[in-house]
């Protein structure tokens, strides 16, 4: 009869029996966990892009439903060579809320919808001119989604925008990267937003903000920022382009649109443009020059005359000649204007652009685009409180005087 092993060791190797059993248990748990992880992943659909449009086929005038488009990455399950890879697809459902749309999508797919990889929240052109901010509230509660998800509007419908991408990857990811790269580091002034920035704007009840507008266009359109979109038969190659921005007032009220050039002038007008470029065309020679903006400050005076507000805007701009373009200042000839002539040309250019921007603010964008509503509230609180309800009408009739002084540095560079 074999004697029991009082040491609790396994065989002649002296390994404790408990250690062997522990290793076997860990291996078993690892195998089970691995199988469970794969099963869990294969049971999910990852949302990369979330688009919202006004309902395409309303059943009545009061139809309060929306078309929700989900751009999905779906793990391929099974035992094929493609198992574990991602399949990309777009799914559109019509519901009254994002939560209801998600529930319907999960039933249709037989998978759990996951938003941890969400890159882009996109609103179609028609819906972007209505009240849509409430449709983002579901995502504000998700911290990881808030910080990584870009928010934008698009030309046409969000559904068609997502459908324009190739089958091999998600255009939502391309668009999110393009939106972030377009403005660049240090220029995040509310033009390109992620969901977190939008949440802060709405929480602070900011008077004015912008959302970038994207479009899929032929490759000969200016300001394209990303390539690689497949072309249909007989069509030109298409590109992802940033074509401007939609402007909104407090609580998401639509105010109008700004093209790319107007946005740059707006940056300069409100003192947010540093390191940017200004393009001018010499009236005499027709040549083009570019100047780098160093600093822009605006002194504002305001008052009321016969019940109508007035504003005096005095900009002081300092810039340097760039190595881009045809002309710099120099000898004072028609070919090489003097520094004073060039400064005058720049002042005329800036005055014309600031005047156009101010007139557009009075027609449609509102005073907040230039910060004039807050300024009036601060400097003339009693008058503003008494006239707040008719502020928009009064501002549209306001007298606005513009003055620009430009200082050109660079030591007389001539080319």
Region locations from a protein language model:
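Membrane-proximal alpha-helical signals and transmembrane carboxylates
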Residues: 11-22, 26, 30-415
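N-terminal secretory signal peptides that target proteins for export/translocation
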Residues: 1-14
